[in-house]
Amino acid sequence: MKKELTRRSFLKLAGAGALAVAMSGSLTGCDVIENLKDMDSVSAAIGDVKFMLSASAWTNGVGGQENDVTYQPTCEIRNNSKKAVTYGGIGSNCEVIITGVLTDKNGKEYPMTYAGENGSAPAGEKYEVKDFKLVAVGKKLYMEGSKVVTTFTYKGKKGCLYRV
């Protein structure tokens, strides 16, 4: 028996697929997620502001019983809004709050704090955050086999960027 895919059936299936992809962001708690592993960069857009991470560097710090892991990607903010947007860590009173979670090779999660300087991305421009840095601290914590989720919270919405 030969099965034919009609134009109408194709459009229904394509619409269902597009809806499934769009809804995957709501399942993870993020509004817009874009993962571009082939291009070695990831980006997320919230309204008129787009956040991009690429070319990451990891460092292990050594301290007594605890180690810190520093994650330093190249971070760019494309601000297509009509006014400058401020960014910083938790407690900075900035419009964009930057946080992260590091998951080690055993699946244990460590909160990451933004350790760069607070700043402002000018309106209508692509802006590189010069000292973007997230730091996690934990016992016997090392970067090998770890992954990071960086979260940008802006106007009550979250954009999550995944790096393995």
Q: What feature does the model see in each segment?
A:
Residues G107-F152:
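Short, solvent-exposed, Trp/other aromatic-anchored flexible loops in extracytoplasmic proteins
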Residues K2-A18:
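N-terminal secretory signal peptides and thylakoid transit peptides that target proteins
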Residues K83-S92:
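Short, hydrophobic/aromatic beta-strand segments
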